[in-house]
């Protein structure tokens, strides 16, 4: 029986990736960098710092980028994301969270590469009564983000549960890679325009089309 549920945020709890992808595309172009929506989907799960540094490393390898520049870049991208409409709760997400909360002795965790200061307020507004700050692993707690296993390892260690009682809910190949490297059971909710072949190297334990399908799948985890 699964008791610890570790949720990614963008593309799982929030239908935010189309606006994230467009914001990255626009702001990268301002800085002379080529970045497509597909690049965003494939790097989803990375910290924004890693996305920015990876783009410079691949396209302008001789360019030295300061931390101050990275912060300004991230702020600029965040403003564009809000301007484009930001994020909305993923259909079916609240029903999944409520169903898990009704199961005995369960823990619900957030594991995200985001570093938004207003994150808890957003979660409480969209999913009241579900998340607490003590069960959130963000870029502040774990700067070495996905695809490294550290974010999910930190959530697992903090939960105090055996690994076999934990379940990761992800939507991104890099998130799946991180979860599998951490040795955790992982369910993919494929809310991005990618195919199973993009996830196959890391062998997800379940591959579902959306959060409503996850709601139907939950009894198998009890």
Describe every region a protein language model picked out.
Residues 104-105, 183:
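Glycine-centered short loops/turns at secondary-structure junctions
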Residues 30-33, 60-65, 103-104, 127-132, ...:
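Short helix-capping segments at alpha-helix termini
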Residues 12, 112-114:
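Conserved phosphate-coupling serine/threonine residues in phosphotransfer and NTP-handling enzymes
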Residues 1-42:
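Active-site neighborhood of HAD-like aspartate-dependent phosphohydrolases
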Residues 56-98, 104, 161:
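Metal-dependent phosphoesterase signature
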Residues 24, 28, 48-53, 74-81, ...:
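Hydrophobic alpha-helical core bundles mediating ligand binding, dimerization, or RNAP-core interactions
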Residues 27-60, 83:
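Alpha-helical substrate-recognition element adjacent to the catalytic core
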Residues 1-3, 98, 115-222:
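Asp-based, Mg2+/Mn2+-dependent phosphohydrolase catalytic module
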